[in-house]
Design a protein with these regions (language model features):
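Aromatic-rich, lipid-facing transmembrane alpha helices and their immediate juxtamembrane interface loops
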Residues: 1-177
């Protein structure tokens, strides 16, 4: 799959999940995202390795978003499947982000510092956009602390995800041209 299609499908999934959460109707957004993720894994150079990468990233995302929620920094509008965990639509977003590592974000390979900087900037911007679209709200601890922690989470996440990704660079880049 080309980098352009990977980027466009990520964006479509992001908007669908966030707007679905804002209106408490995430079923079709999550279903569509999961269908895309299944297709992405099926088309991967090494499906087993890609599945493992996506699963690790999903666990990281679930843990960090749940922690941010428990710290009172972020309240999700649609808490399904459980108010004790981050919501399923956020899980879909983490999987969508993971699908970009060997696609539209493959150019970040070997650039962990740039990955950290972009994560620290783009992560909080994405969450703020979701809040402004009505999918979540800042908790009683406030927006500034929430954005700072999300920036830290994503500054760690991007280099970590790139480290976890063991796909051969040449194969991943050639596949996406």
């Amino acid at each position: 799959m080309s980098k352009l299609w990977n980027f466009l499908l990520f964006q479509a999934g992001w908007f669908a999940c966030v707007l679905g959460a804002a209106h408490q109707q995430v079923f079709w957004a999550v279903t569509g995202s999961l269908v895309y993720i299944a297709f992405h894994i099926w088309r991967a150079q090494s499906p087993k390795q890609e599945f493992s990468l996506l699963f690790k990233i999903l666990l990281y995302g679930m843990a960090t978003d749940t922690l941010i929620m428990y710290l009172g920094l972020l309240d999700f509008r649609d808490a399904w499947p459980s108010p004790l965990l981050s919501p399923i639509w956020m899980w879909a977003l983490w999987l969508l982000v993971a699908s970009t590592l060997n696609g539209s974000l493959s150019w970040l390979r070997g650039k962990p510092v740039l990955g950290a900087v972009l994560g620290a900037i783009c992560g909080p911007l994405s969450y703020e956009a979701g809040v402004r679209m009505g999918a979540a709200s800042w908790g009683p601890e406030g927006q500034i602390l929430g954005l700072a922690l999300i920036g830290l989470v994503w500054a760690v996440a991007m280099p970590l995800f790139l480290y976890w990704d063991q796909s051969p660079i040449e194969g991943a880049l050639a596949k996406n041209l």
